[in-house]
Amino acid sequence: MSFFNFRKIFKLGSEKKKKQYEHVKRDLNPEEFWEIIGELGDGAFGKVYKAQNKETNVLAAAKVIDTKSEEELEDYMVEIDILASCDHPNIVKLLDAFYYENNLWILIEFCAGGAVDAVMLELERPLTESQIQVVCKQTLEALNYLHDNKIIHRDLKAGNILFTLDGDIKLADFGVSAKNTRTIQRRDSFIGTPYWMAPEVVMCETSKDRPYDYKADVWSLGITLIEMAEIEPPHHELNPMRVLLKIAKSEPPTLAQPSRWSSNFKDFLKKCLEKNVDARWTTSQLLQHPFVTVDSNKPVRELIAEAKAEVTEEVEDGKEEDDDDETESALPIPANKRASSDLSIASSEEDKLSQNACILESVSERTEHNTSGDKFSNKVLSEKPTPEGPEKTVDVDGPANDVNLETVAEPNDQAVGFHENGREKKRPQLESQPDTEDQQTVDVNLVGEGNDSNIVILETNTDCLKPEEDRNEENQEIIENKLTQSEEIKDIHIQTMDLVSQETGEKEADFQAIDNEVGFTKEETQEKLGKDDKTHKVVISDITSEVGTDEPPGDTQKSAEQSQDAEGGAGEEAPEPAQTLTEKATEGPEAHGAEEEPRSGERVEDKQLEQQSAVCEGEGQVTSTSESTRATTEEPETDEVDQVSESNSIEELERLGVTGAEEQALGSKGEAATELDLEREENAQELPVKAEPQAPAASQASEPPPVLIPSINIHSENTENKGEMGALPKPETILPPEPENGKGNDTDSGTGSTVENSSSDLNLSISSFLSKTKDSGSVSLQETRRQKKTLKKTRKFIVDGVEVSVTTSKIVTDSDSKTEELRFLRRQELRELRLLQKEEQKAQQQLNGKLQQQREQIFRRFEQEMLSKKRQYDQEIENLEKQQKQTIERLEQEHTNRLRDEAKRIKGEQEKELSKFQNMLRNRKKEEQEFVQKQQQELDGALKKIIQQQKAELANIERECLNNKQQLLRAREAAIWELEERHLQEKHQLLKQQLKDQYFIQRHQLLKRHEKETEQMQRYNQRLIEELKNRQTQERARLPKIQRSEAKTRMAMFKKSLRINSTATPDQDREKIKQFAAQEEKRQKNERMAQHQKHESQMRDLQLQCEANVRELHQLQNEKCHLLVEHETQKLKELDEEHSQELKEWREKLRPRKKTLEEEFARKLQEQEVFFKMTGESECLNPSAQSRGCLQTSHPSSTRAPAWAG
């Protein structure tokens, strides 16, 4: 029987192998049938080419996998079988498969639209809800088909969902899928991509006790929906290995901006992302959800049309801006100005995808102060160029912005309000410099709005110098004109776009990146109405267009508020063109010179007032707009306006008390707008931010009614970088604007901001604005602008017969390549993990096969041993019965012969006696008859005696035989019981050893994963250290140059101040100059020492952080190993308990078996005794039939004997 089973198993194995190679063509060159026409990508297991059939011209994606041996084909047969067996419009089809020269060619259906994640990266924005609905429904239908066919995909993500040009999707990549044989079958393989992995799959890394089923794909679908809504999956900032812990322990992820999405979408996600597997909906249930009740795929067709549109690229260098900057820097700098540095800054953060954001900068401006004796403090907004953060957008909050969107124009004509001793001083309006009339228009693809195509068009116009009255009169006209132009653009050019027109009277539209936070408010200022000031005019025009129902809830509100804001700006009275710049004082110590009174007869010139508004867009896109203004304070009788050049470095960051962090220098790679936060992110340091988010600044006019004024608050989130590979900053949060009320004069709202009234020495008032980040050696603004280029992309495509043109503008910097490098490294990590999982799966399959073979072998051996033992005893019993039968037959033969001989002898004697008696008594018939009867009786008695003797002998022999046979049966049963007990022990030992082998390979695989994780962590730490070293090297190289430039400027200004104010002799002046030079040398030496100490501190902190990250990683790894060992110990204990229970139950069943056997033996003995007793009572009455009767009575005993063995 066992041999038959073995043959059956072997036969089934052969059929299965034949079925696996059923769809693979062997020894045929695929290039004879398919022509390679391009390369699509490089996957984890081989390259993917675009191929075309030479006969039918059908396109295919050809995955070419190099296999070292034919055994490796087994790893890919499941994928081929699934592709070949699936016939569904939303699943890619297998077109062909070849195995040729150790290369496996898998040719699948080609989807020209590309993968969903690739489309999002191409368009640099996520999908809208209407697009997500279409993709979700078709993906659900594909999953439902797979699950009905007992297939678990196990690697569902946006990268495996492909678009066709018809607007449909197809599910692809079944490389790690599982094809079950039973509907309720569960799996315990730890496989898939970590970010999309379900919690029950994650738990299989250390415990196989709770296997998963088809609902694991439902969780992955929910994560994929979040990925499509936010470009990246949840926890994408974490290392692929470390995200597993987050998935297992944290709550189910949600949308970053829930109010931005419909309730149906949120409910659908809730049903998908349910950690309790039993409560999680199935695909068939989800198909009934109202979120997927869509029929048209038009949104996806529009998306694909835009993604596949013809792209026109235009690269612009920033050299014109550089020329302007150089011209400005050449202007003379007054030496008797004093600068203060009360600043409120919050750093913006780099966008994860380094998405496009355009940077707007304005020129330096001058201002006149006409009130003598006023105490005020200029708030200097330090700026850093932002080559990254490329798209010009306006006030977009986060990846899914749900706050009320209001456009903020950079006000160049502003009055700056400050608190001093509990009262507010009005800052004079800032004057603009005249320049040529110029206009630059940038059409920008606004990311993250959730609309189909959100476009922000920023128009930066430079007006000629006009009188105050003319400029004020033009305000409303320009607003109305821009409204009209934007409406035309909305109706004709782009259907679903947000149009924001921003017009400023700047000198030139210089692009400049900034990481500061400014709260802008409009305030009525009556001081300057009568003056002939050349104020900067600001016009804000917001138009939001809504198209169809694709716009998610919240956009309508944004649009309404934008329009209201635009109308409010247009409705202001003509004499009120200026906006008031109201900034909150920051926590901590104020800058030197804040709130310091100007000395008599001395003009105080503030530092270059650099205003910036960092605006978060899309997936954390950073859009920075900046305006550099120069304010000059003069005495009342002074009408002189001093023009001061832009400074080349940023000094005030340390003095602002805004962040406790040290400033970052801009490296040659062109770091993004938020250098401070980027350094903290890259160094994995958690540094406190002292600047609390500003409340919207409020101001009110004295006469006109209050209007809604936009206010932007941008504060960086210092995410604690715990060493995750490629951890990227989160988008900043922008607080929604609040309506202005009667509290406009109270600019200090008490939110933790304080104003320091004490004055501090400004080093002889020698324009400290010239060195803003001197200890960090910041590169000059002009140098930074020379490093950047603006890349304009124009997409033209046709949707439903309407030609649509979308223009995006992107700042191309070295940081783009850095971001791409980070993305490439992340892909490498995922690929390494995929290969590792494949190896683990293969090793697990090999171990499972080996263990199954061991179990089959031991069970086969048990069966053979049992059969051998039974056969041995059966043979002994058979021999005993055969011997007994032979003995009985011999005895019966002897008995028959004896009866015959005895009867013959007695009859002979009786015949003689009868003959003799007849001769004697011829006439005595009666006596003769009696004599004959007597003889017959004697014969019968003799024969009966012989028969009785033979019966007794037979009975003894049969009883002895039965006893011997029962003894053999007892021995046989005892041997079987002993064998069963030994088999139970051996089976337990085998299962125990197999369990240890299972956990051994799990530990081995876990250690390999830990080694890979540690290796990735070390590479990440090494990259951080190298980046810090490079940055510090650049800072050290730049510092001497900056110091030389500063020394020359300071010396010139000092000499000029001596010429103006000094009454000393030339010798005294020379001595003062020597003292000043010595002081400068000492100051520069201190700067070098401070920079060196700062660099050492940065490196030390980074190394400590790296060590902490490694320690934390090792702690997590040790916890996993400990958890695995605990599971192993628990399983071994459970196995021992199961064995003890099984042995106990077997012994309990053994007693009744013994009792039944003994009862059977007693019954056989009793039957035998009864049989011989009955046969012994029978008598042979006819002498002639005696021998036959004896034979008949002896035969049953011999024939029944074998039955007792039964």
UniProtKB/Swiss-Prot annotation:
Keyword match Glycoprotein: no
EC number assigned by the record: 2.7.11.1
Binding site for ATP: 40-48, 63
PROSITE patterns, sorted: PROTEIN_KINASE_ATP, PROTEIN_KINASE_DOM, PROTEIN_KINASE_ST, UVR
Region annotation (Disordered) ranges: 308-352, 364-440, 515-761, 773-792, 1079-1100, 1181-1206
Residue ranges, compositional bias (Acidic residues): 312-328, 634-643
Active-site residues annotated for this sequence: 155
Start-end of Polar residues biased regions: 556-565, 747-757, 1181-1200
InterPro entries in the record: Kinase-like_dom_sf, PKK, Prot_kinase_dom, Protein_kinase_ATP_BS, Ser/Thr_kinase_AS, STE20_Ser/Thr_Kinases, UVR_dom
Gene Ontology annotations for the cellular component aspect, listed alphabetically: cell leading edge; cytoplasm; perinuclear region of cytoplasm
Main location: cytoplasm
Keyword Coiled coil part of the UniProt annotation: yes
Domain Protein kinase: 34-292
Coiled-coil region(s): 468-492, 825-1037, 1077-1151
Record's catalysed reaction(s): L-seryl-[protein] + ATP = O-phospho-L-seryl-[protein] + ADP + H(+); L-threonyl-[protein] + ATP = O-phospho-L-threonyl-[protein] + ADP + H(+)
Low complexity: bias regions: 691-702
A molecular function GO annotation: protein serine/threonine kinase activity
Function: Mediates apoptosis and actin stress fiber dissolution.
Cited PANTHER family: NON-SPECIFIC SERINE_THREONINE PROTEIN KINASE (PTHR46538:SF1), PROTEIN KINASE DOMAIN-CONTAINING PROTEIN (PTHR46538)
Name under which the protein is recorded: STE20-like serine/threonine-protein kinase
UniProt organism field: Rattus norvegicus
Lineage: Eukaryota, Metazoa, Chordata, Craniata, Vertebrata
Gene name linked to the record: Slk
